[in-house]
């Protein structure tokens, strides 16, 4: 069986067009365009690329995009003061602080300082807690983007054995909550998991997010499984690959996401969706 490719690039483009239409309709009705503030501290090259793609996506859909590029020497107090300022700014619906932050700045403190109704990354404990309690508002971008992919391909997740590999706060943990909401029997594996292969072989839906190229061999994949590869790994030869050995896995899976062009574009598309949602659900009616 050759797997059907889940085309994240195309779905992400659809999502962006849908958001752009809604923004156009808002502006035509005399409402303001949603605003996103993107904060980058230091000059991490990978972060600069991510931030660039987020800003570009914002402008494409007609958002107001505000950039704050702070020097590596920025103190925690200065960053927290900027967040306070943005929390109070009625023209801003979403605040995104690009991780990782330089040494000496406490990630947790920074993420918790963002007002939950402007936390378009979905990392604030309030938003994670809402997801845990089955009443999500702003949802973490990568997991929500994956759910959107499954929905757009009309994949029925109810009753599937879902296995998440990797238990990070950004993907693995919130993903497990999304899968419970989607009716899956969900297992999360991590570095202490014994007999990983057995878990993978049992997965009807496999989501891999560990950041290690070729970490999951193709022969472990159950026949007919749905494989979602979150990994983005650049090899020394410049090639970008996922956490799953794609060629082998694609022979066994029913659906698979490629790398690049699978989950990656959905993360940014979901950020855009979240910003519009924050604007409409939380901030409409406030004077900008």
Curated annotation (Swiss-Prot):
UniProt entry tagged with the keyword Hydrolase: yes
GO molecular function: methenyltetrahydrofolate cyclohydrolase activity; methylenetetrahydrofolate dehydrogenase (NADP+) activity
Pathway noted in the entry: One-carbon metabolism; tetrahydrofolate interconversion
Gene Ontology cellular component list: cytosol
Coiled coil (UniProt feature): none
EC number: 1.5.1.5, 3.5.4.9
Keywords: Amino-acid biosynthesis, Histidine biosynthesis, Hydrolase, Methionine biosynthesis, Multifunctional enzyme, NADP, One-carbon metabolism, Oxidoreductase, Purine biosynthesis
Catalysis performed (reactions): (6R)-5,10-methylene-5,6,7,8-tetrahydrofolate + NADP(+) = (6R)-5,10-methenyltetrahydrofolate + NADPH; (6R)-5,10-methenyltetrahydrofolate + H2O = (6R)-10-formyltetrahydrofolate + H(+)
SUPFAM superfamilies named among the record's database cross-references: Aminoacid dehydrogenase-like, N-terminal domain, NAD(P)-binding Rossmann-fold domains
InterPro entries, alphabetized: Aminoacid_DH-like_N_sf, NAD(P)-bd_dom_sf, THF_DH/CycHdrlase, THF_DH/CycHdrlase_cat_dom, THF_DH/CycHdrlase_CS, THF_DH/CycHdrlase_NAD-bd_dom
GO biological process, one term: L-histidine biosynthetic process
Binding residues for NADP(+): 166-168, 232
Entry annotated with the keyword Oxidoreductase: yes
CDD domains: NAD_bind_m-THF_DH_Cyclohyd
Function field: Catalyzes the oxidation of 5,10-methylenetetrahydrofolate to 5,10-methenyltetrahydrofolate and then the hydrolysis of 5,10-methenyltetrahydrofolate to 10-formyltetrahydrofolate.
UniProt family annotation: Belongs to the tetrahydrofolate dehydrogenase/cyclohydrolase family.
Subunit structure and binding partners: Homodimer.
Protein's name in the database: Bifunctional protein FolD
Gene: folD
